[in-house]
Amino acid sequence: MNTILFDLDGTLIDSSEGIIKCVLYTLDFYGIKEPDTAKLYRFIGPPLSESFERYYGFSHEKAYEAVQKYRERYNTTGIFECKLYPGVEKCIRTLKEQGYQIGMASSKPEVSCKRILEHFGILPLFDDVVGATFDGTRDKKSEIL
């Protein structure tokens, strides 16, 4: 049986609004003002801790704490500040009807991925959903795949 894997952010959903607002929330907590929100699009895709380290010079420990702060807002509000791209549901349904197994692999936490797919009513279309763990033991795409 053939399998098709999708990413979540930027492939199935436009999550930019929620991610950017949560990064701004986190930076504000640390007293950092980012006037150019376009720079924050770099946070979409890679693990958050790596982005805080790379773009704001956070130590590994501070980046871990920043991710926890980010999740304070994300888990209640930011997670739903996203949009399913047009045609995604129809595409996945068509692939399922043609006999494909459908999977999703994301560096976003697996629990969050499932909540988002459920929010849009498409979780049952996926044979498997794999994402990062909250404890950081699985957060790179290579580990997820």
Would you name each region that the model predicts?
Residues 1-42, 56:
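Active-site neighborhood of HAD-like aspartate-dependent phosphohydrolases
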Residues 76-104, 110-114, 139-142:
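Short, acidic loop-to-helix structural element flanking the phosphoryl-transfer center
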Residues 28-33, 59-61, 97-98, 121-125:
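Short helix-capping segments at alpha-helix termini
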Residues 26-27, 47-60, 116:
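Helix-loop "lid/cap" segments that line or gate small-molecule binding pockets
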Residues 110-145:
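Substrate-recognition "cap/lid" segment bordering the active-site pocket of phosphatases
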Residues 53-93:
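Metal-dependent phosphoesterase signature
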